[in-house]
């Protein structure tokens, strides 16, 4: 059996690798972008990265899905809105709903320019946009 330190090292390394690959694989380094970004930008994991890693490690999602999870550019000044508890408003099927419940009101568009309906946009729809089987 591996020590806790070894397990932690593996998970940290895996997280860094996945984060770097997610940015490389996303069409423009991201999949979604908020309108009216002022000042510094923040690349947001629509589903928190720790949730993605744990889901992958427990076999709930494939490696391809983990590497292609939605990334959204928002204003750095807005990121505090989304730092709330994923447990309360997190939703794998409808990942943007937590933006709504956090009070985020800016329009978000996909890389192909379509406005995202935060209430209805699904993770399956995200993967379909990328041509990935959900």
Range-by-range predicted roles:
Residues 65-92:
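Short Cys/His-centered divalent metal-binding micro-motifs
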Residues 42, 72-76, 108:
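A structural signal for short, well-ordered beta-strand segments and their strand-loop junctions
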Residues 35-67:
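Histidine-centered nuclease catalytic patch
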Residues 52-59, 82-86, 110:
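Generic local-structure boundary detector
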Residues 1-38, 84-134:
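Nuclease and nuclease-like effector domains acting on nucleic acids or nucleotide cofactors
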């Amino acid at each position: 059996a591996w020590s806790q330190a070894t397990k932690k090292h593996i998970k940290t390394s895996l997280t860094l690798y996945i984060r770097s690959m997610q940015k490389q694989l996303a069409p423009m380094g991201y999949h979604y972008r908020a309108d009216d970004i002022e000042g510094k930008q923040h690349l947001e994991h629509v589903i928190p990265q720790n949730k993605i890693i744990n889901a992958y490690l427990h076999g709930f999602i494939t490696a391809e899905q983990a590497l292609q999870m939605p990334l959204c550019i928002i204003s750095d000044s807005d990121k505090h809105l989304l730092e709330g508890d994923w447990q309360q408003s997190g939703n794998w099927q409808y990942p943007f709903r937590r933006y709504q419940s956090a009070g985020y009101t800016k329009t978000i568009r996909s890389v192909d320019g379509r406005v995202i309906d935060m209430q209805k946009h699904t993770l399956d729809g995200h993967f379909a946009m990328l041509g990935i089987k959900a």
